[in-house]
């Protein structure tokens, strides 16, 4: 009897699992290339909704509702749910699922890319995000006005850990400090890959984000310009990070614009490199590294540069 190759067995099992997935999803083929992994565990869905502490008067923004496993439970607790979904097939499934139910009138569906969509007013955001858009969506949320109360978001585990990382942590990065400048961030729970259909290749985590209201009195473009420079090589000293010719050209251009606007005469022997080093030394950050600096450190450094007419945007 001929042997059956293990590869053929694996492919057959894969097709069988795929057929089971299609059957359980009403015949839909999920597109994992755009992050379609449907959260199927009702215990985790209930836990996420509990963490949101919804009020009967709340408008909830749900991003990536999929086939509506979480949506139907949100509709039971909130005044209104605005669901943003990219895939028209899933939109049809979602509408079919709530059609004719007492909560159908509470659902509004936005069809399209949430990053390109003008967000409506909402009190709370609950989302099982496609991982490809996680980072830009966080900042779209945090720069949204009027302020929302909180967001309960599912992320790829590593990205979630970056959001909550502290100075000195291996994963501490530009995303960490920018998010924590604008919001309080808490890691709520881990979610294993088998809680999704189809399972993703990585583990997930749920994070709670609460925007700071009022926000810190800082120009975010200025702030991010500084943070971007220092975190390109977060293990370098700031003195080394600012020796980049591209960085010095940008800052000199901005400095000359500042001086022109304020009628400040620039000496003929002016050196932007010397000016930068003077500021780093006077603020005490010349030998510091971005990986170990907290929000207060960066605020002091930004104020030090701005006070000398050097800007980052």
UniProtKB/Swiss-Prot annotation:
Region (Disordered) spans which residues?
Answer: 1-21
Reading the lineage from the top rank, the first entry is Eukaryota
For this entry, list what GO says about its biological process. Answer: positive regulation of rRNA processing; ribosomal small subunit biogenesis; rRNA methylation
Identify a single GO molecular function assigned to this protein.
18S rRNA (adenine(1779)-N(6)/adenine(1780)-N(6))-dimethyltransferase activity
Short name of any one Pfam family annotated for the protein: RrnaAD
The protein's annotated catalytic reaction(s) are: adenosine(1779)/adenosine(1780) in 18S rRNA + 4 S-adenosyl-L-methionine = N(6)-dimethyladenosine(1779)/N(6)-dimethyladenosine(1780) in 18S rRNA + 4 S-adenosyl-L-homocysteine + 4 H(+)
Q: Which residues bind S-adenosyl-L-methionine?
A: 37, 39, 64, 85, 113, 128
Q: Which PROSITE patterns match?
A: RRNA_A_DIMETH, SAM_RNA_A_N6_MT
Q: What is its EC number?
A: 2.1.1.183
| InterPro entries in UniProt | KsgA/Erm, rRNA_Ade_Mease_Trfase_CS, rRNA_Ade_methylase_Trfase_N, rRNA_adenine_dimethylase, SAM-dependent_MTases_sf
Report whether Transferase shows up as a keyword of the record. Answer: yes
> What are the entry keywords?
Methyltransferase, Nucleus, RNA-binding, rRNA processing, S-adenosyl-L-methionine, Transferase
The cellular location(s) given in this protein's UniProt record come to: Nucleus, Nucleoplasm; Nucleus, Nucleolus
Indicate the principal place this protein occupies in or around the cell. Answer: nucleus
Q: Which GO terms describe its cellular component?
A: nucleolus; nucleoplasm; small-subunit processome
How does the annotation summarize its subunit structure?
Part of the small subunit (SSU) processome, composed of more than 70 proteins and the RNA chaperone small nucleolar RNA (snoRNA) U3.
Role according to the record: Specifically dimethylates two adjacent adenosines in the loop of a conserved hairpin near the 3'-end of 18S rRNA in the 40S particle. Involved in the pre-rRNA processing steps leading to small-subunit rRNA production independently of its RNA-modifying catalytic activity. Part of the small subunit (SSU) processome, first precursor of the small eukaryotic ribosomal subunit.
What the entry lists under PANTHER family is as follows: DIMETHYLADENOSINE TRANSFERASE, DIMETHYLADENOSINE TRANSFERASE-RELATED
Please state which protein family the record places this protein in.
Answer: Belongs to the class I-like SAM-binding methyltransferase superfamily. rRNA adenine N(6)-methyltransferase family.
Protein name as catalogued: Dimethyladenosine transferase
Q: Which organism is it from?
A: Macaca fascicularis (Crab-eating macaque)
What is the taxonomic lineage of the source species?
A: Eukaryota, Metazoa, Chordata, Craniata, Vertebrata
Question: Gene name, please?
Answer: DIMT1
